[in-house]
Structure formats: C-alpha cells, structure tokens
Amino acid sequence: MKASEMKKGSIVEYNNGTYQIRDIQRSSPQGRGGNVRFRFVMYSVPGGSKLEASFDADEMLTAVELLRREASFSYKDGEAFVFLDEEDYTLYTLEAEAIGDNAGYISEGLSGCYVQLIDASPVALQLPQHVVLEVVDTPPELKGGTATKRPKPAKLITGIEVMVPEYITTGERILVNTTTGAFGGRAS
C-alpha cells in the first residue's frame, strides 16, 4: 500500500516490527519537481515505543491485516480501558499507551469501536468516525456582539477541548470527529 493511502490507525510492518500510525503530516513539495512526503508518528504494537519516519507519497508499505472485533467501551480499570465484544461478550483490556490520544473520545457506553487483535491479544483500537460527547463547560453566547460567527472553546465530559459555534451551551451533546478532533454538529 502506498504511503499516501495510509490512514490514522493503520497497522504497518516497518524495520522488522509492527507499528500503528497515530499521526500523519503531509509536506508539500518546494519548487519544481519536488516530491510530496508523509511523516508518520508510529507506535510499536504491542509495546508502544514511539517511532517517527518519513516516506515519499508513492513509497510502498506493507499493511498488516489484523483480526478486528466490534466492541463497546465497558469501563476503565485504573489506567486501562476495558471493551466488551458485542458478539461473544469477551472482555478486551487495552492499556492507555495503546489508546493514546484517542482516550479523549472514549465515554461511557461508546459503541461501534473495533478492537484489533494479534494472536488473540488486543493491540490497538479503531474508533468510529464520530462520537457523541457532552459539553460540560463553555462560555455563554454573546448576544449582539457581532454579525460574524466566532467559535468558542468547549470542555467535554472526557476532558478534551474542542472549538464550537457560539450557539452551543453547557449540557448539550455534540458530535466530534475522531480523526480531526473538530466539532461535527449537534447530536440528535
């Protein structure tokens, strides 16, 4: 698979190891004939040691096919997250290092997740595209302040902060994109 086709959460083989891509940065070419490069922040699976590597857009990487099991978040056990397989009720425990920055999107009752397994042991988590989270703190809307729409910060129930439109109030449930971390609208 080409480096340009990789997505956040993909599992690849690199330097005789297995890694999960956690962040992707694209650099545009400078001048004529320059190549687009991708910088990946990867973590070893299992283990969690960090590795940064850069690749040309057409450079080939070997994607690892993992067994994926649909699961829902059950509870937190210390720093570990426990997920329940929705088919056979198996519990999968993932350490905080395996979850990484995605921990801010995991709330009580979250479903539609996929636990990724190597040899029947959980190594990574794939979140749904959008999650519903409750706003626990945001400044009130300024009436008549300006005709332009200004975003404001909102603290969510999981502790992360996202920028939301002025009309969002404390206590509302909103959609958050798990790839970009951006506001995606009011939850119905």
UniProtKB/Swiss-Prot annotation:
Gene3D superfamilies, A to Z: 2.30.30.30, Nucleic acid-binding proteins (2.40.50.140)
Gene Ontology cellular-component terms listed: cytoplasm
Domain of life: Bacteria
GO molecular function terms noted in the UniProt entry: translation elongation factor activity
InterPro entries: Elong-fact-P_C, NA-bd_OB-fold, Rib_uL2_dom2, Transl_elong_fac_P/YeiP, Transl_elong_KOW-like, Transl_elong_p-like_YeiP, Transl_elong_P/YeiP_cen, Transl_elong_P/YeiP_CS
GO biological process, one term: peptide biosynthetic process
Pfam families assigned to the protein according to its UniProt record, in alphabetical order: EFP (PF01132), EFP_N (PF08207), Elong-fact-P_C (PF09285)
SMART domains for this protein: EFP, Elong-fact-P_C
HAMAP family, per the entry: EFP
UniProt cross-references to PANTHER family, sorted A to Z: ELONGATION FACTOR P, TRANSLATION ELONGATION FACTOR KOW-LIKE DOMAIN-CONTAINING PROTEIN
Protein family per UniProt: Belongs to the elongation factor P family.
Listed name of the protein: Elongation factor P-like protein
Source organism: Xylella fastidiosa (strain 9a5c)
